[in-house]
Amino acid sequence: MTKITLFPHNFRIQKQEATPLKEKSTEKNSLAKSILAVKNHFIKLNSKLSERFISHKNTESSATHFHRGSASEGRAVLTNKVVKNFMLQTLHDIDIRGSASKDPAYASQTREAILSAVYSKYKDQYCNLLISKGIDIAPFLKEIGEAAQNAGLPGATKNDVFSPSGAGANPFITPLITSAYSKYPHMFTSQHQKASFNIYAEKIIMTEVVPLFNECAMPTPQQFQQILENIANKYIQNTP
């Protein structure tokens, strides 16, 4: 079987009427049909990208007239907004709520992954803070483990401390950041910008998934975060 490798090419997007290629009357074998379908797909995609590109350019032109700062500052502010809008659209395209409404298993796994990510983030954050203050973290780990277990997260108990089995990074952040970086790489050149986009990605994801928790006994990500913060503050405030 012939292996076809597609290599990326740099090209300029131009607004034009896209006309899908017509299938020839001869050589109607399966390989030809597959290649034709791929070509037509990319023609349509090219047209959609052209429209989106022109839309962004028009937005830039109209918004710049209302900006009171320097030209460079205006471009920076506008571009950040465009990147964030792109990330928001990417999140809508993932359609977490739609997939969850059709697949209960997906909904359950999403809730567990989100709460496990909250647990992992704040466990690391507060453990580092407590250690810096010379506070023993063992009681803290035991208590937040119990909170995670009470929240309904699956996991295992080791050395009398419960740990969620899915603890780790938020699984939806990477697709948003990766897609935005691929389209706007020049906006990810500084650590400050990267951190800003990561914070924004996490924010819109947490807002998007809240409805998934409305019909279950699990706390929302925001409620679970507050539970972990309250536990940590108890140990911090008791520091001599």
From Swiss-Prot:
<dbReference type="InterPro" id="IPR016018">
    <property type="entry name" value="SopE_N_dom"/>
</dbReference>
<feature type="region of interest" description="GEF catalytic domain">
    <location>
        <begin position="78"/>
        <end position="240"/>
    </location>
</feature>
<dbReference type="GO" id="GO:0005096">
    <property type="term" value="F:GTPase activator activity"/>
</dbReference>
<dbReference type="Pfam" id="PF07487">
    <property type="entry name" value="SopE_GEF"/>
</dbReference>
<dbReference type="InterPro" id="IPR016019">
    <property type="entry name" value="SopE_GEF_dom"/>
</dbReference>
<dbReference type="Pfam" id="PF05364">
    <property type="entry name" value="SecIII_SopE_N"/>
</dbReference>
<dbReference type="InterPro" id="IPR035949">
    <property type="entry name" value="SopE-like_GEF_dom_sf"/>
</dbReference>
<dbReference type="GO" id="GO:0005085">
    <property type="term" value="F:guanyl-nucleotide exchange factor activity"/>
</dbReference>
<dbReference type="GO" id="GO:0030036">
    <property type="term" value="P:actin cytoskeleton organization"/>
</dbReference>
<comment type="similarity">
    <text>Belongs to the GEF (guanine exchange factor) SopE family.</text>
</comment>
<dbReference type="InterPro" id="IPR005414">
    <property type="entry name" value="SopE"/>
</dbReference>
<keyword id="KW-0343">GTPase activation</keyword>
<comment type="function">
    <text>Acts in concert with other proteins to mediate cellular responses leading to bacterial internalization. Activator for both CDC42 and RAC1 by directly engaging these Rho GTPases and acting as potent guanine nucleotide exchange factor (GEF). This activation results in actin cytoskeleton rearrangements and stimulates membrane ruffling, promoting bacterial entry into non-phagocytic cells.</text>
</comment>
<dbReference type="GO" id="GO:0005576">
    <property type="term" value="C:extracellular region"/>
</dbReference>
<keyword id="KW-0964">Secreted</keyword>
<protein>
    <recommendedName>
        <fullName>Guanine nucleotide exchange factor SopE</fullName>
    </recommendedName>
</protein>
<keyword id="KW-0843">Virulence</keyword>
<keyword id="KW-0344">Guanine-nucleotide releasing factor</keyword>
